[in-house]
Amino acid sequence: MESLQRLLQGARMGTGMMGDQPLVDNSECVYISSLALLKMLRHGRHGTPMEVMGLMLGEFVDDFTVRVVDVFAMPQSGTGVSVEAVDPVFQKNMMDMLKQTGRPEMVVGWYHSHPGFGCWLSSVDINTQQSFEQLTPRAVAVVVDPIQSVKGKVVIDAFRLINPSTLMMGQEPRQTTSNLGHINKPSIQALIHGLGRHYYSLRINYKKTELEEIMLLNLHKQPWAHGLLLENFNSAAEKNHASIDKMKSLSEQYTERVQNEVTLSPEQLRIQYVGKQDPKKHLDAEVQKCIDNNISSMLACMLDSVAF
């Protein structure tokens, strides 16, 4: 109660005292390394359908840059909408062991997963972020969706809380000094859950070194002789039958979805399939995969018949 009275008293005194205080700039960017991003996605996928969380290691380079170089998972149990608080004993032991392996970076924030329901902060997440910002005012909360994330597009966002005193005094939570911090269109779920009122979104970028680019290009790369291997005909026939059955099921799902879209309003269509499987995309991918496998097996069979 006393803190609320002091806050109201400061608001009545005017905004002149708040004018000289440093404000967060909207061009502030969070740079996440490839290693940290892969670890977050893998941790989130393994925990599906439950939420998982972990801590991010890095440094605050300047007033506009937060660099995340690595992450590690926390042994927290989660539900469908929240995760528990951080275990300080595990965090201290993990930080000590990481320093011995040449990882002296500090904790710059935390991450957790929202499997299938978008990137936003719940009330429990806001309380967790408040505890982080009490220790480090510039701490960042990263939310990743491992279900909606696909190859080439990661559903991820970074947030930080808005000081309630700035809202009471009618001030903007961030100042604008450049056009670097362009505003990404927020999702409806994030706006409903307090984006722009209780917390704001930070820009995310990914910096890759030459070695990291080589590592990512070779991540799922097959050797040159892999395409010349001739698969067993029985196993290839079984795969083709399974692929055809899957394509039949996906085509039925897509037909049913198209028929249902006629009866839905535009507002219902906007949120009807959020976090659900898109049968059309999966059908295209399955057809392309089946064609590629059959073409490569036919070419390998022809080469083997000519060579041997």
Swiss-Prot record:
<feature type="short sequence motif" description="JAMM motif">
    <location>
        <begin position="112"/>
        <end position="125"/>
    </location>
</feature>
<feature type="binding site">
    <location>
        <position position="112"/>
    </location>
    <ligand>
        <name>Zn(2+)</name>
    </ligand>
</feature>
<dbReference type="GO" id="GO:0046872">
    <property type="term" value="F:metal ion binding"/>
</dbReference>
<keyword id="KW-0862">Zinc</keyword>
<dbReference type="GO" id="GO:0005634">
    <property type="term" value="C:nucleus"/>
</dbReference>
<dbReference type="GO" id="GO:0008541">
    <property type="term" value="C:proteasome regulatory particle, lid subcomplex"/>
</dbReference>
<dbReference type="GO" id="GO:0070628">
    <property type="term" value="F:proteasome binding"/>
</dbReference>
<keyword id="KW-0482">Metalloprotease</keyword>
<keyword id="KW-0378">Hydrolase</keyword>
<dbReference type="GO" id="GO:0000502">
    <property type="term" value="C:proteasome complex"/>
</dbReference>
<comment type="function">
    <text>Acts as a regulatory subunit of the 26 proteasome which is involved in the ATP-dependent degradation of ubiquitinated proteins.</text>
</comment>
<dbReference type="GO" id="GO:0034515">
    <property type="term" value="C:proteasome storage granule"/>
</dbReference>
<keyword id="KW-0479">Metal-binding</keyword>
<keyword id="KW-0647">Proteasome</keyword>
<protein>
    <recommendedName>
        <fullName>26S proteasome regulatory subunit rpn11</fullName>
    </recommendedName>
</protein>
<feature type="domain" description="MPN">
    <location>
        <begin position="30"/>
        <end position="165"/>
    </location>
</feature>
<dbReference type="GO" id="GO:0034399">
    <property type="term" value="C:nuclear periphery"/>
</dbReference>
<dbReference type="InterPro" id="IPR037518">
    <property type="entry name" value="MPN"/>
</dbReference>
<dbReference type="InterPro" id="IPR056263">
    <property type="entry name" value="RPN11_C"/>
</dbReference>
<dbReference type="InterPro" id="IPR000555">
    <property type="entry name" value="JAMM/MPN+_dom"/>
</dbReference>
<dbReference type="GO" id="GO:0005737">
    <property type="term" value="C:cytoplasm"/>
</dbReference>
<feature type="binding site">
    <location>
        <position position="125"/>
    </location>
    <ligand>
        <name>Zn(2+)</name>
    </ligand>
</feature>
<dbReference type="GO" id="GO:0043161">
    <property type="term" value="P:proteasome-mediated ubiquitin-dependent protein catabolic process"/>
</dbReference>
<keyword id="KW-0645">Protease</keyword>
<comment type="subunit">
    <text>The 26S proteasome is composed of a core protease, known as the 20S proteasome, capped at one or both ends by the 19S regulatory complex (RC). The RC is composed of at least 18 different subunits in two subcomplexes, the base and the lid, which form the portions proximal and distal to the 20S proteolytic core, respectively.</text>
</comment>
<dbReference type="InterPro" id="IPR050242">
    <property type="entry name" value="JAMM_MPN+_peptidase_M67A"/>
</dbReference>
<dbReference type="GO" id="GO:0140492">
    <property type="term" value="F:metal-dependent deubiquitinase activity"/>
</dbReference>
<dbReference type="Pfam" id="PF01398">
    <property type="entry name" value="JAB"/>
</dbReference>
<feature type="binding site">
    <location>
        <position position="114"/>
    </location>
    <ligand>
        <name>Zn(2+)</name>
    </ligand>
</feature>
<dbReference type="Pfam" id="PF23594">
    <property type="entry name" value="RPN11_C"/>
</dbReference>
<comment type="similarity">
    <text>Belongs to the peptidase M67A family.</text>
</comment>
<comment type="function">
    <text>Transcription factor pap1 is controlled by the functional interaction between the positive regulator pad1 and negative regulator crm1. Both these proteins are also essential for cell viability and for the maintenance of chromosome structure. Pad1 is also responsible for resistance to staurosporine, and other drugs such as cycloheximide and caffeine.</text>
</comment>
